[in-house]
From Swiss-Prot:
One of its GO terms (cellular component) is cytosol. This is 3-isopropylmalate dehydrogenase. Substrate binds at residues 96, 106, 135, 224. Belongs to the isocitrate and isopropylmalate dehydrogenases family. NAD(+) binds at residues 78-89, 288-299. Homodimer. Its EC number is 1.1.1.85. Keywords: Amino-acid biosynthesis, Branched-chain amino acid biosynthesis, Cytoplasm, Leucine biosynthesis, Magnesium, Manganese, Metal-binding, NAD, Oxidoreductase. It comes from Wickerhamomyces anomalus (strain ATCC 8168 / CBS 5759 / DSM 6766 / JCM 3585 / IAM 12210 / NCYC 432 / NBRC 10213 / NRRL Y-366 / AJ 5027). Binds 1 Mg(2+) or Mn(2+) ion per subunit. One of its GO terms (molecular function) is 3-isopropylmalate dehydrogenase activity. It comes from the Eukaryota.
Length: 364
């Protein structure tokens, strides 16, 4: 038996509820698979960490994460901590940088076709949407040179990218494309008509694909045009979508409304290619901490699907990850849903249903 260590960072507000449901489903796998054992280690991050320690990411949490097989994160932030000098989101940025989590993967698809009616896009246009945004996560404007307003009325942020950074994220996108037969097309989003960093981005993506992955195709699209296409004809972008940190942040949030709720979409942030299904990664839902949501009302599906990604990409438990995805589809098809999906079930009820479905699938 090989024990997998998972550092759990619940974070703020609904973070504890959603990570609890994901853990519950993972423990169900332990029950069915005697050779699988998880070691869950809980630590603080975000506003909860600020309240307890004065910093958004305590050293002990970071050190535990460095030694783990994977990290499961809930959500951070909330109006309580405002936009002061010490903010919850700083903990998230720090852990990404310290763990070198350079690639953020955000799938956009329908976990169940029964959800098509909930999409703000007409079903005939939304049906079949299936792409993954591969976002560069530790470079660009979020980590560039920054100048706060010192009273002069001027502030600035600097966007910087290097060839090695762009090559690295391009190789991740290529790897993901090659997991399919035939390989998926790659879309690269930038603002090369205006930004020097985007011109370097486009040139490097093109050269890397041509030299290292000649069997793949890449199409370049300006980010503003891509944002329009995403609403007008989302299936046009089916495949792998690669882009920079800020553009990826924006376009993936826009994409997240297509399936009908932020509560459905998982994400993975990886430190290496998952070529042996053992890449170190941090897994979290795409939604925020939802401070105004009453207890037991948050949708846990995105976090459960994040756990499924963790099983497949970091813990070398691919079959179990697929089983979780099938379980989620069964739950949604059965109409067990929280309020964001026009359902009446609680967080716990959805989690319980996922547990029972996963057990049944794994036993067959």
């Amino acid at each position: 038996m090989s024990e997998k260590t998972i550092v759990v960072l619940p974070g703020d507000h609904v973070g504890t509820e959603i990570t609890n449901e994901a853990i519950k489903v993972l423990k169900a796998i332990e029950e069915v698979r005697p050779n699988v054992k998880f070691n869950f280690q809980h630590h603080l991050i975000g506003g909860a960490a600020i309240d307890a320690t004065g910093v958004p990411l305590p050293d002990e949490a970071l050190e535990a994460a460095k030694k783990a097989d994977a990290v499961l994160l809930g959500a951070v932030g909330g109006p309580k901590w405002g936009t002061g000098a010490v903010r919850p989101e700083q903990g998230l940025l720090k852990i990404r940088k310290e763990l070198n989590l350079y690639a953020n993967l955000r799938p956009c698809n329908f976990a169940s076709e029964s959800l098509l009616e909930l999409s703000p896009i007409k079903a005939e246009f939304a049906k079949g949407t299936d792409f993954t945004v591969v976002r560069e996560l530790v470079g660009g404007i979020y980590f560039g040179e920054r100048k706060e307003d010192d009273g002069s009325g001027v502030a600035s942020d600097t966007e910087t990218y290097s060839v090695p950074e762009v090559q690295r994220i391009t190789r991740m996108a290529a790897f993901m494309a090659l997991q399919h037969n035939p390989p998926l097309p790659i879309w690269s989003l930038d603002k090369a008509n205006v930004l020097a960093s985007s011109r370097l981005w486009r040139k490097t993506v093109t050269e890397t694909i041509e030299k290292e992955f000649p069997q793949l195709t890449v199409q370049h699209q300006l980010i503003d045009s891509a944002a329009m296409i995403l609403i007008k004809s989302p299936t046009t972008l089916n495949g792998i979508v690669i882009t920079s940190n800020m553009f990826g942040d924006i376009i993936s949030d826009e994409a997240s409304v297509i399936p009908g709720s932020l509560g459905l979409l998982p994400s993975a942030s990886l430190a290496s290619l998952p070529d042996t299904n053992k890449a170190f990664g941090l897994y979290e839902p795409c939604h925020g901490s939802a401070p105004d949501l009453p207890a037991n009302k948050v949708n846990p599906i995105a976090t459960i699907l994040s756990a499924a990604m963790m099983l497949k990409l970091s813990l070398d438990l691919f079959e179990e990850g697929v089983a979780l995805e099938k379980a989620v589809k069964e739950v949604l098809d059965a109409g067990v849903r929280t309020g964001d999906l026009r359902g009446s079930n609680s967080t716990k009820e959805v989690g319980d249903a996922a547990v029972e479905a996963a057990k049944r699938i794994l036993k067959n």
